[in-house]
Amino acid sequence: MTTTISTEKQSIKQIFLWEILWILVPFGIYFLSHIVHPDWYKHFVYQSWGFLQGRLDLLNLPEYYVDLIYWKDKIYLPNPPLPSILLMPFVAIWGIATEQIRVCMLFGAVDVFLVWILLGRMTVQGVMRFGLTILYGFGTVHYSASIIGTIWFYAHVVAEWGMLLALVEFFGKRRFVLVGFFMGLAFLSRQATILGSLFFLGWLLWERPEKWIQKGFSFGAGFTPLFLFQSWFNWARFGDPMESGYMLQNYYSSVQAPAIHKYGLFNFAYIPKHIKLIFTEMPEFLPQFPFIRPKPEGMNIWLTTPAFFALFAANWFDVLVILAGLSAFLISLPAMIYTATGWVQFGYRYALDYLPFLFVAIASGLQRMPQALAWTLIALSVIVNVWGVYWVVKLGW
């Protein structure tokens, strides 16, 4: 009995130490990466302030803010409410002065910790578990998103939080009511992420068909309350439970406006420019030192994160890898037909909507390839993203 209690205390102590390592250290690095920052485009702070005042609209926004909805003499956001809800304790203390970017850094660090837990539950051990965690936190666009922290990037980081919680639960006790709830959290930040439910429900259908209805119902029981909350949020503002505001959006940046007037917000005509950005867009080459810098439009995923090449080495005969790839593909589709490609950004920020799922396949590939090559790809990815963050800060993105 004494031995059991001692072992449990030791286990709790180890977990606490890893929490310190994988939350405080990444947060510290994110903080130091962007100490002096422009305190702008923090729409969610204003939304959170409105919630605390019992309002659903936004007041006293700076004039330069974009991506807004003007509806019946009020200003609204088309974005789901979870990022604003999570800010409420901070806004209750500091009001509009709350630095959204710091909260984004905190959730970015929590995401890194969840990746560490996830990899352990995926039976990735030893130095590769460490390397993959570093890769996620500092070798992907998660790094730059976490230290930019404006409305668009903060929403991505919170959505990652929900998806990673769902994956951690799935690779753990597989309580599908919690998996559904966590995916609901992701949905309340970035709605396209709900398409990642294929990963969990597809696994049920493939591996546990006799429990598909039971577990699928449990998933729905966890997800439905959050879906209903989003529906109420829509109805309370626009009188339509299915209208989030995107189709009512009427204030765009000057860059987006011409295409929107021709094609609308969503159109298949936008797919080619997304494909170009994702797979072939190069950085900007300069005639003088430093000779190269990232473009504000973005940069292809292979240069941004060379470890993505590990996808070609992944075990695509593994049902989980297949489902991870399919889920990532499905989640990517709504963004592919959207007018904006994510500008201004380092890399391709919409990849964050499916990075947690894609990372399952990346982890598979990095473990299967020669370790020297795997570590080279991880190191290159970190170097590129440190370079990217340098320019993000220098250029004021």
Model regions and ranges:
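Membrane-proximal envelope and lipid/glycan-remodeling enzymes
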Residues: 1-397
